């Protein structure tokens, strides 16, 4: 009988304390591009893929605002699950920090990436076509640590 009681207690403790869940420590950002027009409007687009939340991603993230100012403080990706922020203030596409933070869920995530047009893979071109003052694009997939 002692063996049976011990076995039941061991089995119950195994179910009470599940193994640690493996988590991914990066967000993948693809299709990352931004541009400004000659009338000072700015736009940014990227796609977030998060291995920790496969049911919510990939999701598009799109921003429109007046260049030289900051986008809306509580801007979110299209699925509403990621805040988009620029912690260094108003965005200059030649040098800026992008911050993403998961709005809710069991795995908290917040990460930043600094981008500079002076070094690949973030590339910016001045006056690429009529009406566009600056056009920038990330070559490849950006992996943001969270």
Predicted regions and their residues:
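Small-side-chain structural scaffolding
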Residues: 11-16, 61, 111-116
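Fungal secretory targeting signals
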Residues: 1-23
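Detector for Asparagine
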Residues: 5, 20, 25, 52, ...
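Acidic, low-complexity intrinsically disordered segments
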Residues: 69-146
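Short, surface-exposed binding/anchoring microloops in extracellular/periplasmic proteins
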Residues: 19-70
């Amino acid at each position: 009988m002692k063996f049976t009681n011990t076995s039941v207690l061991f089995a119950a403790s195994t179910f009470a304390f599940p193994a640690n869940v493996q988590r991914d420590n990066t967000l993948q950002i693809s299709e990352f591009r931004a541009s400004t027009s000659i009338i000072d409007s700015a736009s940014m687009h990227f796609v977030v893929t998060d291995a920790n939340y496969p049911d919510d991603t990939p999701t598009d993230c799109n921003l429109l605002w007046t260049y030289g100012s900051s986008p809306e403080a509580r801007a979110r990706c299209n699925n509403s699950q990621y805040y988009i922020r620029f912690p260094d203030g108003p965005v200059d596409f030649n040098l800026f920090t992008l911050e993403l933070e998961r709005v809710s869920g069991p795995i908290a995530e917040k990460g930043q990436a600094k981008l500079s047009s002076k070094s690949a893979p973030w590339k910016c071109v001045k006056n690429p076509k009529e009406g566009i003052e600056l056009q920038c694009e990330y070559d490849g997939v950006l992996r943001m640590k969270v």
